[in-house]
Amino acid sequence: MIKKRKKKSYTEVYALGQYISMSAHKARRVIDQIRGRSYEEALMILELMPYRGCYPIFKLVYSAAANASHNKGFKETNLVISKAEVNQGNTVKKLKPRARGRSYPIKRSTCHITIVLEDISFYQQYEEYLMYLKKPGCSNENRNLTCYDTYSSGGLWDKK
């Protein structure tokens, strides 16, 4: 079962997978390889790794990217896995019947995986704006974000 969780941040998108039947230790082994990488690079790594835990994580990363493109309109080329965490879930306990009426306990561990994708294009635009402000030709008069001509040009604002 995959649940999606949203946060109020404008550049982050969450996807949460709960009760995935895999131990948290085995899932962390895969998650540590993709943390901090771009979306496309993470998908390639997950496709080529030979572990069974890669497939549910692959689906979760793909789902988070689909949330980003559908809900917030982000491009998949600008997405980076900023946060990926694995928490231990419930342990399902079963009894396996054995010879002579005995039984052995079987423990099936689960985990909860959270993937956070972040859009880096916002930060690139912000850095470009800061570089523009640091240019020597840019004086304090040019740094005003609101255009003075918009309010003083007449048009709709002066007519009543």
Swiss-Prot record:
GO CC field:
chloroplast; chloroplast envelope; chloroplast stroma; large ribosomal subunit; plastid
- Where does the UniProt annotation locate this protein? Plastid, Chloroplast
Q: Which one of the record's GO molecular function terms can you name?
A: rRNA binding
Q: Name one Pfam family in it.
A: Ribosomal_L22
| Primary location class | plastid
Can the keyword Endoplasmic reticulum be found in this entry's annotation? no
| Gene3D superfamilies with a match to the protein in the record | Ribosomal protein L22/L17
The UniProt subunit note reads as follows: Part of the 50S ribosomal subunit.
The record's annotation in PANTHER family points to:
CHLOROPLAST 50S RIBOSOMAL PROTEIN L22-RELATED (PTHR13501), LARGE RIBOSOMAL SUBUNIT PROTEIN UL22M (PTHR13501:SF10)
**What's the family?**
Belongs to the universal ribosomal protein uL22 family.
- Protein name, entry field: Large ribosomal subunit protein uL22c
Source organism lineage?
Eukaryota, Viridiplantae, Streptophyta, Embryophyta, Tracheophyta
